[in-house]
Swiss-Prot record:
An annotated Gene Ontology molecular function: oxidoreductase activity
Domain Rieske: 19-131
Pfam families associated with the record: Rieske (PF00355), VanA_C (PF19112)
SUPFAM superfamilies assigned: Bet v1-like (SSF55961), ISP domain (SSF50022)
Thermal dependence, as annotated: Optimum temperature is 30 degrees Celsius.
EC number(s) from the headed UniProt entry: 1.14.13.179
Cofactor: [2Fe-2S] cluster
Gene3D superfamilies: Naphthalene 1,2-dioxygenase Alpha Subunit, Chain A, domain 1, Rieske [2Fe-2S] iron-sulphur domain
Keywords carried by this UniProt record: 2Fe-2S, Alkaloid metabolism, Iron, Iron-sulfur, Metal-binding, NAD, Oxidoreductase
Organism: Pseudomonas putida
Positions bound to [2Fe-2S] cluster: 64, 66, 87, 90
The name this protein goes by in its record: Methylxanthine N3-demethylase NdmB
GO biological process, one term: alkaloid catabolic process
Function in brief: Involved in the caffeine degradation, which is the essential first step for assimilating the carbon and nitrogen in caffeine. Catalyzes the N3-demethylation of theobromine to produce 7-methylxanthine and formaldehyde. Also catalyzes the N3-demethylation of 3-methylxanthine, caffeine, and theophylline to xanthine, paraxanthine, and 1-methylxanthine, respectively. NADH is the preferred substrate.
Length: 355
């Protein structure tokens, strides 16, 4: 009999209420010779244009209200001390609020209030550009990242990268302990220690929090691997702040990652490394992380169907992903009920054990 497949999350519109990264600040500034955009990105299947207008990066629908040309192949221009986003087709110019302020073909005519493009919340934090498509609930924050602004720490903001999988599977990959022995033997883990204890998982202020102490007796791990005691703070829906107290010198090493849903088939991934007491050049840290990602990617992209299925069998050591899936399901259902229900689902604490 053919297996009956059913996705866990049938309605993912709730994700529009969260902040998602769409590019690094460096990627934005490299996208156009001006350094101000425009730049086209896609978030949750929606084409967006980014542009720096009057010193602030804005996000808007990447479609001119006139004849639907993509504004991301237009230009940023200035007039009378103000910046505008100009359509490449007929030169319509939009301000930072998305309103059309000039129609060159009809310069003396009044402009219809319909001549506007949808604009969205957009902020720069951690040298990353963040967008929120729906602010009607206004109860979500840009995810947590520890020590980014600490002057005693060294920071690497890596270029983003695309995987052909959904953001849920990418998040689960990063927080899954059981795969280390099989996907990363000799890189991150000693296969002799394939089993591990279950952990306490807490919901705290919109985060999943848990800890893990890998076996210190592991052998064959390369010296560049950041091994130590792991503390996770994972802001919903897809961010992971992994703080490691390194065994070699008790210094702190933070590996932060976020998966951003491009569409229903792919996600754009972001990585920041924050470290202290480290004289190694940035490229060595990036090379090691690329080695780990290259081991993970073919396995994660092999998972099908792409969406998480209700029929997937879980065991005790899948506790983190089980709690993650449960919370996403609750968020999906609560968003339909309205702002208060969604806010309660995001912020209600569920404590298994005091940290």
């Amino acid at each position: 009999m053919k297996e009956q497949l059913k996705p866990l999350l049938e309605d993912k519109t709730y994700l529009r209420h969260f902040w998602h990264p769409v590019c690094t600040l460096n990627e934005f500034e490299r996208a156009n010779a001006s350094g101000h955009g425009p730049m086209g990105v896609t978030l949750l299947g929606e084409k967006l244009v980014l542009a720096r207008l009057n010193s602030k990066i804005i996000a808007a629908a990447d479609r001119c209200a006139h004849r639907s040309a993509q504004l991301s192949i237009g230009r940023v221009c200035s007039n009378a001390g103000k910046d505008y986003l100009e359509c490449p087709y007929h030169g319509w110019r939009y301000d930072e609020a998305g309103a059309c302020q000039l129609i060159p073909a009809c310069p003396d005519k009044s402009i219809s209030p319909r001549a506007k493009i949808s604009s969205f919340d957009c902020e720069v934090k951690y040298d990353i550009v963040w967008v929120r498509l729906d602010n009607s609930f206004d109860c979500t924050q840009i995810p947590y990242l520890s020590d980014f602004d600490n002057p005693d720490m060294q920071v690497i903001v890596a270029d983003s990268y695309i995987w052909e999988t959904v953001a849920e599977r990418r998040w689960e990959n990063f927080t899954d302990f059981s795969h280390f022995a099989f996907v990363h033997p000799g890189t991150l883990y000693d296969p002799f220690f394939a089993s591990h204890p279950t952990v306490y998982v807490n919901r705290v202020d919109g985060e999943l929090q848990f800890k893990l102490a890998p076996p210190r007796e592991m052998k064959g791990i390369p010296p560049e691997a950041p091994m130590g005691d792991f503390t996770y703070r994972c802001t919903m829906p897809y961010s992971v702040n992994l703080e490691i107290k390194l065994w070699k010198d008790d210094s702190r090493f933070v590996l932060w990652t976020t998966a951003s849903p491009v569409d229903n088939k792919s996600c754009r991934n972001f990585m920041i490394i924050v470290r202290e007491k480290d004289n190694q050049p940035d490229h060595m840290h990036l090379a090691f992380q690329k080695r780990v990602l290259d081991e993970d990617q073919p396995v994660i992209e092999s998972q099908w169907p792409l969406e998480i299925q209700t029929s997937e069998v879980s065991v005790a050591t899948d506790k983190i992903s089980v709690q993650f899936r449960k919370w996403h399901k609750e968020l999906s259902l609560s968003a339909v009920e309205g702002r208060e229900a969604f806010r309660d689902s995001v912020l209600t604490n569920v404590i298994e054990e005091e940290q």
